[in-house]
């Protein structure tokens, strides 16, 4: 089985594939420093929790946006999974995605993985919206090229900043409000968060689609990321919600490199 690992600034998501089937997935916090051995304990506990053992893993694929974690993960692979082929998405790894950027090396590996998965699953042109620590928008051409994107503050950090800077505002559970026109502060915050971010997504996606092609109806918009369920149903431009897009892309990249 293939173990896929998507390390983000807030969470690390693990996925276990058998062939093309995602058998299981887990989410743990990326915050706080863990050593290579501690990450190995996390992985082993997750596998044993589902009655899986070390010997079941015959491949590993990872993308990571946190350099410190990537270094520890790399050591963990060598120390605890030395006989298992491991692919880390970084410069030199075959992705099959031409990167049309001023500096291709500065593009986050998760964004390239998402672009590959979107192009392979749905075809181009496409826009991937990833709701994470930041909300990222990634544009894929009709030829499957990564042609650029946009980065906006994510939902959680925006809410946190608002509660810290607003003397009479507080943290709220982010759920769909009863109406856009709220009757109390809690509902007003929820309305602004849910419909504000949905409007942001629709606005940026519309503009990207116009730059990608003359026929905007040809553009497939794919939403992913841990925070997508909070607003994706209110986004008029989103065609597909694929929560495991990054894990699927990692599986595809592993297959290209082994």
Curated annotation (Swiss-Prot):
The family database entries (CDD domains) matched by this protein are listed as: ASKHA_NBD_PanK-III (cd24015)
Query: What is the reaction catalyzed?
Result: (R)-pantothenate + ATP = (R)-4'-phosphopantothenate + ADP + H(+)
Residues noted as binding K(+) in the record, renumbered to the chain = 130
Disulfide bridge map = none
Q: Name one GO molecular function term.
A: metal ion binding
Family that this chain belongs to: Belongs to the type III pantothenate kinase family.
Q: What does this protein do?
A: Catalyzes the phosphorylation of pantothenate (Pan), the first step in CoA biosynthesis.
Q: Which sites are catalytic?
A: 110
Where does the protein end up? Cytoplasm
Residues reported to bind ATP: 6-13, 133
Record has Transferase as a keyword: yes
Record's keyword terms, sorted: ATP-binding, Coenzyme A biosynthesis, Cytoplasm, Kinase, Metal-binding, Nucleotide-binding, Potassium, Transferase
The species this protein belongs to is Thermobifida fusca (strain YX)
Name of the protein in its database record: Type III pantothenate kinase
Which gene does this sequence derive from? coaX
Q: Can you name a GO cellular component term?
A: cytoplasm
GO biological-process terms attached to the record: coenzyme A biosynthetic process
């Amino acid at each position: 089985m293939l173990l896929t690992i998507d390390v983000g600034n807030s969470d690390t998501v693990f996925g276990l594939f058998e062939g093309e089937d995602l058998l299981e997935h887990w989410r743990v916090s990326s915050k706080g420093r863990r050593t290579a051995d501690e990450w190995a304990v996390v992985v082993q506990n997750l596998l044993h929790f589902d009655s899986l053992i070390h010997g079941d893993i015959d491949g590993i694929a990872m993308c990571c946006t946190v350099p410190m974690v990537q270094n520890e993960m790399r050591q963990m692979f060598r120390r605890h999974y030395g006989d298992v082929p491991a692919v880390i998405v970084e410069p030199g790894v075959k992705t099959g995605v031409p990167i049309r950027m001023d500096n291709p090396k500065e593009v986050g590996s998760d964004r390239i993985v998402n672009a590959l998965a979107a192009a392979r699953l749905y075809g181009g042109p496409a826009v991937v919206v990833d709701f994470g620590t930041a909300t990222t928008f990634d544009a894929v051409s009709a030829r499957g090229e990564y042609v650029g994107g946009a980065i906006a503050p994510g939902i959680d950090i925006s809410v946190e900043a608002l509660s810290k800077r607003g003397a009479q505002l507080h943290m709220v559970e982010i759920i769909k409000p009863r109406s856009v026109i709220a009757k109390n502060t809690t509902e007003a915050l929820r309305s602004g968060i849910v419909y504000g971010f949905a409007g942001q997504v629709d606005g940026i996606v519309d503009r990207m689609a116009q730059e990608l092609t003359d026929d905007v109806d040809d553009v497939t918009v794919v939403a992913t990321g841990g925070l997508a369920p909070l607003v994706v149903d209110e986004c008029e431009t989103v065609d597909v919600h694929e929560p495991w897009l990054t894990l699927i892309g990692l599986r595809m990249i592993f297959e290209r490199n082994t």
